[in-house]
């Protein structure tokens, strides 16, 4: 199957220029059409008024009952000679022409090709193509006339209730047609020039209008990894670009946060790994510096094994967090009773709690959730391990389970020294410690709470922490 070649969309400047120019040119042509149509209607009304005026004059002569036909025709010829660009034809009741304009063909011969005049408002008015003849023009000497506007009407004394004549009057409209054609040609020429000007003006206007976009683009191009704290000012751009600038600022803020976290993460993990590696090297060098007994070598190996185990756990935890960061942490959900899961975690920590003189207590109902049992037990284990680490001897750690508004909450409470408010938002950050100096006395690697948050988020839940004089409370909220 042959794929279609990639075709880049037209630029915004091209599209804007095309549509604005098209709209403007269309508006101009619409105006030109209205003008031409108005002129045509005006000329048609003017011609019809002239025809009615002529017909009224001739009708008075032909309707006179006391005149003979010869006398009527003589009077008719005298009147017609006073009109230029007008042809007359008079037919009797038998359809025979009794008079037509001297020196001109009989217009009745051309009436079979007559068509109704659509520009005439009311009345039976027709357009004729022919006869062709030279006649005086409007200030232009003689000109060829071949297009006529014609009316016909019954006139003359009544015989058997019907007029004895039918009068045909044709008025030349060639001057009007020439005027309209000249006007159309001038409008077309003007439209062509204006269209070209409009395209260039719109191109210039669009180029000027896109200046803020180019300005924003230059500002964005100047932002490097060292300038992630730079923000664009939405007040300095047009309102149409404000949302774009705000979105960019939000994006760069997220990038800065991720970049900062990654930098800190790299520094922290390098520091965390460097210390056990240094210990391994130091212990090994000391062991090799002189002859050692088997017991001393075994002690060194056990110490090295402890450091290696700690490093392996840290690497495993980091891989787990990397999966969470890449949305690859997919829980294998099944219906669980959280009371049972808490009991299993209690069984695991029971010996350690007794050794430290701390009591473990569960309070609550049998809360049902859909979740991954291994992940949830790991999250609970990390919270309980953290609570055991900071709970004074003789105190009690309480784990509560409750259902609130179709949500299940697991609360881990432990008494102890309260955590300062400024530290609470960062407790779930990797390698973050409230007291950085306490790194090696059983406090762990500093990523346990980060793992808790990743597991809870993977289950579409939330985790929060509060701390006061009564102790510290971690609250996991999961969908029921």
From Swiss-Prot:
Per UniProt, the enzyme's principal EC class comes to transferase
Q: What is its main location?
A: membrane
EC nos:
2.7.13.3
Q: Which loops or segments lie on the Periplasmic side of the membrane, by the record? A: 37-186
MF GO annotations: ATP binding; metal ion binding; phosphorelay sensor kinase activity; protein histidine kinase activity
Sequence intervals crossing the membrane: 16-36, 187-207
Which one GO biological process term can you cite for this protein?
A: signal transduction
Q: Which UniProt keywords apply?
A: ATP-binding, Cell inner membrane, Cell membrane, Copper, Kinase, Membrane, Nucleotide-binding, Phosphoprotein, Transferase, Transmembrane, Transmembrane helix, Two-component regulatory system
Q: What happens when the gene is disrupted?
A: Deletion mutant has higher susceptibility to silver and shows an increase in copper accumulation.
**Record keyword Metal-binding present:** no
Q: HAMP domain: from which residue to which, for each copy?
A: 208-260
Subcellular location as annotated: Cell inner membrane
The chemistry this enzyme catalyses reads:
ATP + protein L-histidine = ADP + protein N-phospho-L-histidine
The family database entries (InterPro entries) matched by this protein are listed as: CusS-like_sensor (IPR048590), CztS_silS_copS (IPR006290), HAMP_dom (IPR003660), HATPase_C_sf (IPR036890), His_kinase_dom (IPR005467), HisK_dim/P_dom (IPR003661), HisK_dim/P_sf (IPR036097), Sig_transdc_His_kin-like_C (IPR004358)
Ranges for the Histidine kinase domain? 268-480
What does its PTM field state?
A: Autophosphorylated.
Q: Name one GO cellular component term.
A: plasma membrane
The record describes the protein's role as:
Member of the two-component regulatory system CusS/CusR involved in response to copper and silver. Acts as a copper/silver ion sensor. Activates CusR by phosphorylation.
Q: What else is known?
A: The cus system plays an important role in copper tolerance under anaerobic growth and, under extreme copper stress, in aerobic growth. HprSR and CusSR form a unique regulation system, where both two-component systems recognize and regulate the same set of genes, but under different environmental conditions. HprSR plays a role in H(2)O(2) response regulation, while CusSR plays a role in Cu(2+) response regulation.
Protein name in the entry: Sensor histidine kinase CusS
Lineage runs: Bacteria, Pseudomonadati, Pseudomonadota, Gammaproteobacteria, Enterobacterales
């Amino acid at each position: 199957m042959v794929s279609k070649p990639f075709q880049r969309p037209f630029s915004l400047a091209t599209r804007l220029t095309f549509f604005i120019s098209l709209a403007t040119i269309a508006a101009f042509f619409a105006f030109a059409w209205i003008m031409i149509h108005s002129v045509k209607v005006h000329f048609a009304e003017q011609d019809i008024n002239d025809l009615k005026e002529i017909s009224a004059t001739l009708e008075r002569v032909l309707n006179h009952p006391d005149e003979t036909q010869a006398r009527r025709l003589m009077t008719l010829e005298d009147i017609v000679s006073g009109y230029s660009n007008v042809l007359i034809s008079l037919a009797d009741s038998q359809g025979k022409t009794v008079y037509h304009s001297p020196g001109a063909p009989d217009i009745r011969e051309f009436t079979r090709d007559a068509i109704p005049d659509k520009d005439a408002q009311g009345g039976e008015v027709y357009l004729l193509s022919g006869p062709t003849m030279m006649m005086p023009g409007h200030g232009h000497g003689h000109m060829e006339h071949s297009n006529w506007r014609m009316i016909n009407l019954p006139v003359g004394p009544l015989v058997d209730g019907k007029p004895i004549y039918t009068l045909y009057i044709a008025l030349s409209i060639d001057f009007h047609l020439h005027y309209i054609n000249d006007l159309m040609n001038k409008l077309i020429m003007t439209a062509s020039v204006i269209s070209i000007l409009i395209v260039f003006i719109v191109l210039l206007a669009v180029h000027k209008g896109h200046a803020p976009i180019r300005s924003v683009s230059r500002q964005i191009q100047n932002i490097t990894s060292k300038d992630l704290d730079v923000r664009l000012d939405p007040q300095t751009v047009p309102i149409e670009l404000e949302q774009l600038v705000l979105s960019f600022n939000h994006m760069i803020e997220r990038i800065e946060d991720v970049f900062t976290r990654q930098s800190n993460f790299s520094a922290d993990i390098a520091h965390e790994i460097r210390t056990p590696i240094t210990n391994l090297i130091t212990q090994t060098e000391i062991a090799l510096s002189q002859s050692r007994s088997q017991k001393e070598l075994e002690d060194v190996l056990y110490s090295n094994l402890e450091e290696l185990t700690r490093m392996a756990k840290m690497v495993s935890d980091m891989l787990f967090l990397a999966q969470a960061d890449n949305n690859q942490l997919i829980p294998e959900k099944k219906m669980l009773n959280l009371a049972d899961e808490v009991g299993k975690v209690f069984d695991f920590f029971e010996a350690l709690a007794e050794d430290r003189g701390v009591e473990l207590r569960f309070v609550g109902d049998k809360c049902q959730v859909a979740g991954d049992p291994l992940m949830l037990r790991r999250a609970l284990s990390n919270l309980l391990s953290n609570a055991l680490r900071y709970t004074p001897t003789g105190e009690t750690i309480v784990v509560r389970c409750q259902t609130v508004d179709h949500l299940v909450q697991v609360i881990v409470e432990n008494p102890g020294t309260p955590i300062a408010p400024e530290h609470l938002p960062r407790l779930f950050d990797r390698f973050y410690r409230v007291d950085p100096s306490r790194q090696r006395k059983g406090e762990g690697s500093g990523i346990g709470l980060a793992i808790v948050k990743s597991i809870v988020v993977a289950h579409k839940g939330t985790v929060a922490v509060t701390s006061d004089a009564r102790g510290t409370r971690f609250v996991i909220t999961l969908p029921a």
